[in-house]
Amino acid sequence: MKMLSLVSLAAALTSLLALAGCLQNNGADTVTVNGDVPLAYVKRSTSITMNPTDGTSSADGGDLIIREKSSASAAEHNITAQFTQGHGDASDPEVSYDGKKIVFAMRCPASNTTATVNGQPACTGRWNIWEYDLSGLPSGTFTGGSFRRLTASTSDDDVDPAYLPNGAGFVFSSNRQTKSRLNQANGQTYFALDEYERERVLNLHTMDANGGAITQISFNQSHDRNPVVRPNGDIMFARWEHLADRNRFAIFRVKPDGTDMFVLYGAQSPGNSFLHPRDMDPNGPYAGFVVSDLMPLSRSQEGGALMFIDAANYSENNTPANNSIPAIGGQRQATAQALNADRGVSTYGRVTTPFPLWDGSNRVLLAYRPCEVTKNGVVVSCATLTADEMAALNDEGMTDAQKAASPVQDNAPAVYSIYMFDPAKQTWLIVAAPPAGFMYTDPIALQARPEPNAAQATPVDATLAAQNMALIEVRSVYDTDGLNRMAEQMLAPADLPAGCSKGIATTAPTDTTDTRPLVADLVRMKDPADAAYGCAPARFVRAIRAVAPPSNVMGMRTAIGETNFEQQQILGYAPVEPDGSFKLQVPADTPLALSIVDSQGRAFQTHTNWIQVRPGERRTCDGCHSPRRGGALNSGAIVNTMPAALKTALSAEHQAGETMAALRTRLNPSALSLGSDPVFSDIWADTSRPGVSAKATLSLRYTGNPNPADDLATPAPTNGLINYPDHIQPLWQRPRGTGGANTCTNCHTDPVKLDLRNTVSGTGRLVSYDELLIGDPVIDPVSGKPVTQIEDGVPVVVRQPALVETSSSMSNTAGQARKSRLTEILFGQTLLAGSSALASHPNPPGTAPDHSTMLNTAEKRLLAEWMDLGGQYYNNPFTAGSGVRVVNSLDQATFTAQIQPILQTTCAAGCHQAIGSDQVTSTGASFRENRLVLTGSPEGDYGSVLSMISDACHPASNLLLMKPSTVPHPAGATTQVNAVLPAGSTGYTTIANWIVRGCPAQ
């Protein structure tokens, strides 16, 4: 078969696919190409919807296929037809290290009662892990092998299996959540949905070689997918990071026991979702490189660009391991012609599921589909389109409605074929083309490869493990990466104490390979005799855990509120020592976030990814948000310098290599425990020395402060769960001033300006909440109408900044309270809200009371905590009043049969798609504007729809019906005449009748 370049491939593939019948010839007379290898892949229906967000997508017609050679004319064999019988699916094959076994995921129908395993029905209707064993077959024979079903889930889904080395078993992704469902926030037990409130979360699990001892090893709040084992024995996988505005897949690594989890690449690099990562040949010229397909979060059928990632030398595209490596160069496209890694048309096609060969050839097996669209309903090659037609497909200024009216649509089936790609020669050899209505993906070479090293187990503290606790130590929060996300740029002049020109003293790095021009001068910052000691801004670390969205409940969207954040719980506080270190015990196997807090209880940063530690694990990090590969800043001579102005009783006990936090907690183990309040007393400064002053004592308690006037007079949160109606609204109604003259609700009752009363708005929430979190529309001075703009094909209303900022940006930027204009007004400081927020919400007039003195210390702490967490309406979904309740009468089967087709027709093709984030392109529609995410996944769409229902007894009052039956919808479609889903229409009535079935009275 002729080898093609990508340019000629794009033009020739249409005719190649037309020859698919010839390519499927199973005769013995095959074309043999030097270097051919046997391979396996999956055949799947093109009716399936594949997105990174959909971890268990399925459609009838899928099977595992083995092809005898990597040649288009070689024989192929359907291995699983006896189980699927045309009504099942297969995915995610992986080959054993000796090349003689295949582990894969298969969903075969429970209606198949003829296929058995150990005398029991083999098929459960759910995704399970299977193994096909060829080891007993003659060489060159691929049929007649034996099957093992390793898992037997009847209510869970197990996918993405891979072999662990040394016969240790398997790693796989599963939504069974064996531990996390028993250990949810506030003592609850339930299956967690992802952070779109759609699908049950897929986490990494391991099991032994016989399918036993299933253990959950990852605890992300959205999917962990595509695990494989690296040559060093680590597990590498794609992690969906979806905390606040961050919404992408990065490449992570972890040991098989779940310890030492950290990002490997892609948390802050161009592009959105790095999926299907695999190591290139460790003995070839690409040793240390990882191949991945980089794609958008939706609308590309999991296809994107083929990326070669220099993971050995870069932690991000612009973060080299040392200064001898170019500053930028962590990733590059492997193909000569660039493929589109974003949404829209990709002129040269898309790639998915790459598999690099480790045979010295440096070739990559992959699935590729050409650029095809439909024109007047007929599939055509993009090469046949005019320049204007191509431009229209990629015109971001067009609305979805305008694009839907075009005869040319980017909706052709994803007909992936299997290719052998040679990156050195830039040639493509077609290996297998699917029959009509199907795709081929997930190719793997059936050849032996070196077995990875067995990763050594991490030593754990048995005492901590028995308590289901772990330990985290950060050597210095000031040891940040080149993006300076915990550096001077995060501070405002108001943060600087009197006499300080900067908050963080800096110096040139002592490490000659360091890539940073300046680093924090920790020796000065921990010296009480130096002015830098009193200028350092970090005072506390706040530990937070996720409150996962429960499955099978309604009302979650209303309960969460106008925010990009999910619900969260504050676990407690610990001090940050003068050198920037902290050391604390935290719950194990729990999704955690850590925020560094200033002296007034406001976070410097938003921690937009979840971290975890296993029971008994002692986890040490060099710094915060720092994927650098260099040595720790707080080490060597720096960490071992004990300034003379420190108390001798402490400095004399210092041991080599100890941070100040390690020293303190060794001498006082109780300091390892989180406290419920941010309180501080300087134990370090030896004030008996001339010119040495201690840092001021801090007490930010809810109650019990030295001055009772600083205590809360309103209800305090319980167990770190802050609910706006219960804890924030009472602040506005608390009597203040003489005779209550300065009570907030005395003045702020104007709906046009600011209304802080506790009346209920049209959203079902308190008016004051919506007033604080939703900015007013920007009005065109000429027309007097709201200004609109197109975002991701959707017309949206342009709004002024809200008083409370709930958009984090995906780059771990400033804390929410510090970016909120409400904070600046009530603290009397200019922080990081910005000029546009100031213009929209100017300082109160001079005739008004001094707003900076209206709230006391505890009230300001509470308000800052609520804003930093994301401004949720409720953080406890199980509290009375949240509106969240379990609903069993609105079943998924009825939804899939009756409701989903209506939504797919009227809603899913437009704005209701997952929108990703990356470092280059704009975010697109924020989640506050796009809450109902519909991808075609029955489970996911069902979960998303339930979240939009809050009152089953009154269907018309629910967002699910109220929004699309109102004109305009979306709000920016100001010229819209007819509702998307008019009240009384057949679709509307069908949905309303389904909703009312969930009413307890029905």
Regions found by a protein language model. Name each.
Residues 18-21:
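C-terminal motif of bacterial Sec signal peptides marking the signal peptidase cleavage site
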Residues 10-13, 905:
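Compositionally biased, intrinsically disordered low-complexity regions
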Residues 1-10:
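Bacterial N-terminal signal peptides that target proteins for export
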Residues 227, 576, 584, 952, ...:
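Exposed regions on extracellular, virion, or secretory-pathway luminal proteins
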Residues 30, 34-36, 59, 125, ...:
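Aromatic- and Gly/Pro-enriched helix-to-coil junctions and flexible linker segments
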Residues 23-553, 557-559, 564-579, 585, ...:
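Sequence signature of WD/YWTD-type beta-propeller architectures
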